[in-house]
Curated annotation (Swiss-Prot):
Glycans are attached at N113, N126, N161, N186, N238, N254, N264. It comes from Mus musculus (Mouse). It catalyses: S-hexadecanoyl-L-cysteinyl-[protein] + H2O = L-cysteinyl-[protein] + hexadecanoate + H(+). The gene is Cln5. This is Bis(monoacylglycero)phosphate synthase CLN5. Belongs to the CLN5 family. GO terms for molecular function: bis(monoacylglycero)phosphate synthase activity; D-mannose binding; long-chain fatty acyl-CoA hydrolase activity.
Amino acid sequence: MLRGGPCGAHWRPALALALLGLATILGASPTSGQRWPVPYKRFSFRPKTDPYCQAKYTFCPTGSPIPVMKDNDVIEVLRLQAPIWEFKYGDLLGHFKLMHDAVGFRSTLTGKNYTIEWYELFQLGNCTFPHLRPDKSAPFWCNQGAACFFEGIDDKHWKENGTLSVVATISGNTFNKVAEWVKQDNETGIYYETWTVRAGPGQGAQTWFESYDCSNFVLRTYKKLAEFGTEFKKIETNYTKIFLYSGEPIYLGNETSIFGPKGNKTLALAIKKFYGPFRPYLSTKDFLMNFLKIFDTVIIHRQFYLFYNFEYWFLPMKPPFVKITYEETPLPTRHTTFTDL
């Protein structure tokens, strides 16, 4: 079990909100031939975590194996949504539409309920910003995300400040197929991505990078269910997205090409300087000073360094710079090539 100690690499939730707070206040050469949005990189296996990376809150403490359902079982699929860190702050972050998403299942044959969600192993701050360790030449990332499956649904957690609603009904056979997909998806999609990066807020604006977070997992799960023949109800489903807005991103390189022995020392210094203010703060004064540095870099000088697919990109930022949205993504349409047997 991973726990945060006084010297551990956990980040306080308030740090992760530093740039989100900026959003509430605000409301090289371009890469030629690049595919946009940049495809999320998948891996052949999930690597072991570094002991330096410590979680303040243990990941998936009540996790259990996914059971095999009887083919003739009738299972309700539930949409689960609640404010992030609701266990600590209640509905506070719900007022800013900062929501966490999950999927629930309810078996008719057994009467048992199950929850599956995808989230960070080491909390949001660690997945969004690195640590600048004196013993490492490059920024050090504690960034992994994974699926957590466990028996039971915390009705109070989801209903009190969020949503618990049935979106579809499937068979046990379909559940088993989705369970196999979840295992494969979990082993190949290993890291969390907070930001969705776009050219602008308008409809049809170019997307440069897609987020890979809890809501993305829910949407992928719904899509896979639709591929297996699931028919969803006609209800509105909204999700939180955190946007960065920039001109065409500029590819910079990976850790070796930038921070290695033959790397670009000037660029390496600029990247480390950028990430410096995002470190855990020690006092209110420290927090305010770092916030002003972030504002100066991102808003005044319009610079942002993004780490995506274990590679660094420069984002030439532009208005409105940062924005949190809570918008509808429709439930998928059933694929007619499959039947829900």
